Amino acid sequence: MPVRLAVPEVDSIGPFNRLSASQVNAYTTCPRLWYYEKVRRFKMPQIPVLFVGRAVEEAFCRMLQESPALLVAGAAADTLSNIPLDDSGVPSRDSGATWPADRLLPLPVNQWPSTMDTLRDWAKQRLETHLPLALHAMEIEWEKDERKAGQWSSVDPERCMSMCLNGLEMNLAEGERCLEAKGGPELDAWRLGKRPYWPSPDGRAYEIPLRHPLAQEGAVTLVEAWEIARPWFVDPNAGKFAMNAIHPEHWFQGEYDLVYRWDGRINIVDLKASVGAGDRSGNYVEQLRMYAMLWWVTHNREEQVDALQIWYLGANAIKQIEVPTVAEME
């Protein structure tokens, strides 16, 4: 499971005192700077690039959440935004809650993308809808920050869109693999409406009572492959840090960017809106290795990650990270 919530009865540490991969890397890189930021609470200058990455990731995930069998390319950006949340900001498990995608009727099948090019065109238009809104929201947040530095005019929307499109191509490659694998091992279960305990966010409820509304017959279709290969990610509408994976002893937590699992393997992906040439790039490797450990311990030390990847959206490159051994994780 990509999410493991805290158990309040035994959590003596609390959400603000847990370690994270970024804190570990910050301390390893410069203990003094870590002390100033985490202990003395000094806040470093907040430059626009720190906010741009969040905007790119949000636009990308909102596109992933959507289905070309439900939404036309020009649909409103907030079509799937009104999801029910519990008091902690986690998507609600209330069986009586109303979910936006469950209220939509599928488009006629003859309007579904039938080629990779038409699917790509649809997804690109969805990104063009979501990215400007995400950038605007981040600009407002940056403007309100008392430690803001630099100029928002330094943000290049075209470069941000280029990074989103690079991510799209990487995800389409997963969809193409799913097509070639004839839907993978979960095709029949998906068509029957069976879902993991933490399903990939698609605007639907945790459980589908009957057959999946987009299920077809015979060979897997392109739209089915899009749906099946959709990775898990934090629902863009969930509360901030509401969907962490928390160590059973509550001293460490992490939030995965993408988890691909359609083929029966676990591939954790970290999205980076950069080219990977900075001083911190080495920390990204250790961050993913810590995530592999976190996955292992939150699955009773019985399930290991199969692959770790960093998607450098600025460089249009995928970096494969060696998965740590059990001995290393212990």
Predicted segments with their positions:
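C-terminal, charged and often intrinsically disordered regions of DNA end-processing helicases
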Residues: M1-V49
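Alpha-helical architecture
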Residues: Y27-T28, A55, E255
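Short loop/turn segments at secondary-structure transitions that flank enzyme active sites
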Residues: L33, F42, R62, E66, ...
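Short, hydrophobic/amphipathic alpha-helical patches that form generic packing surfaces
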Residues: L33-K38, R54-E66, N166, M170, ...
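Hydrophobic (often cysteine-bearing) scaffold residues that line and stabilize catalytic clefts
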Residues: P48, V52, C160, C164, ...
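A non-catalytic, helix-rich entry segment at domain boundaries
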Residues: R62-D235
